[in-house]
Amino acid sequence: MRPSGRKTDQMRKVSFERNFSKHAEGSCLVKFGDTHVLCTASLEEKTPPWLRNTGKGWVTAEYGMLPRATGERMKREAAAGKQGGRTQEIQRLIGRSLRAVVDLQALGEKQITLDCDVIQADGGTRTASITGGWIALYDCLKWMESRNMIKVDRVLKDHVAAISCGVFANQAVIDLDYLEDSSAETDANFVMTGAGGIVEIQGTAEGTPFSEEEFSSLMRLAKNGIGELVALQKQAIAG
């Protein structure tokens, strides 16, 4: 039995609140149960130096957690003068995941930065950031389209979403909350497109290596879960 009472293949309640920020070109407050992340997409009329005069744009991401997003207050990384390794890893993952479904040539020489700020953390912050970040990116591109800068269907090739899966109490489960994640035998994150293409898989065994059969079980859970998330994304942007 999972601590939350959920079935092994049952995700937490997921919601998207679009246009949460009045200033950003695109924004979304995404909630995976008690994990809440504010994703904003900001358009800049510039590209990284290595892309200048290439006609290509760029999509990148930054990630952070508010000091009291967790059970005990964390010091702001800015106060320490540098980002931690976990933060850098997660924001690179978010950027890679979103770029996987963007035609950078069709975007033109512009940069879109996704800022994913965790308001409340209860496991799965990186997967929530990717899934909600796609909504914010979509709305940013719609903003650009409304000003005749691009055509969304030429720039955005597909949906992308992410979910965590793991082995908890000898069972393959989906969408781990913090309690499960902190004591899981295996923890994995899956990033996939709406068409089912795999963008990235991160998997780690805690103590006991996991088997190919267990990995296949996690993969099946993730594929079904991401299908549900993509359906929710479609529902959100249609509203």
Curated annotation (Swiss-Prot):
* Binding site residues for phosphate: 86, 124-126
What's an example of a GO molecular-function annotation for this chain?
3'-5'-RNA exonuclease activity
GO process terms (BP): rRNA catabolic process; rRNA processing; tRNA processing
> InterPro entries in the record, alphabetically?
ExoRNase_PH_dom1 (IPR001247), ExoRNase_PH_dom2 (IPR015847), ExoRNase_PH_dom2_sf (IPR036345), PNPase/RNase_PH_dom_sf (IPR027408), Ribosomal_Su5_D2-typ_SF (IPR020568), RNase_PH (IPR050080), RNase_PH_bac-type (IPR002381), RNase_PH_CS (IPR018336)
Q: Does the keyword Transcription regulation apply?
A: no
Could you tell me the superkingdom of the organism this chain comes from? Bacteria
PROSITE patterns (UniProt xref): RIBONUCLEASE_PH (PS01277)
UniProt entry tagged with the keyword Kinase: no
Which SUPFAM superfamilies does the protein's record reference? Ribonuclease PH domain 2-like, Ribosomal protein S5 domain 2-like
Q: Which reaction does it catalyse?
A: tRNA(n+1) + phosphate = tRNA(n) + a ribonucleoside 5'-diphosphate
Q: What class of enzyme is it?
A: transferase
- As recorded in UniProt, its EC number(s) are 2.7.7.56
Supply the alphabetized keyword list: Nucleotidyltransferase, RNA-binding, rRNA processing, Transferase, tRNA processing, tRNA-binding
- List the cysteine pairs that form cystine: none
This chain's function reads: Phosphorolytic 3'-5' exoribonuclease that plays an important role in tRNA 3'-end maturation. Removes nucleotide residues following the 3'-CCA terminus of tRNAs; can also add nucleotides to the ends of RNA molecules by using nucleoside diphosphates as substrates, but this may not be physiologically important. Probably plays a role in initiation of 16S rRNA degradation (leading to ribosome degradation) during starvation.
Q: How does it assemble?
A: Homohexameric ring arranged as a trimer of dimers.
Give the protein family.
Belongs to the RNase PH family.
What is the protein's name according to its record? Ribonuclease PH
Q: Which organism is it from?
A: Rhizobium etli (strain ATCC 51251 / DSM 11541 / JCM 21823 / NBRC 15573 / CFN 42)
Q: Which gene encodes it?
A: rph
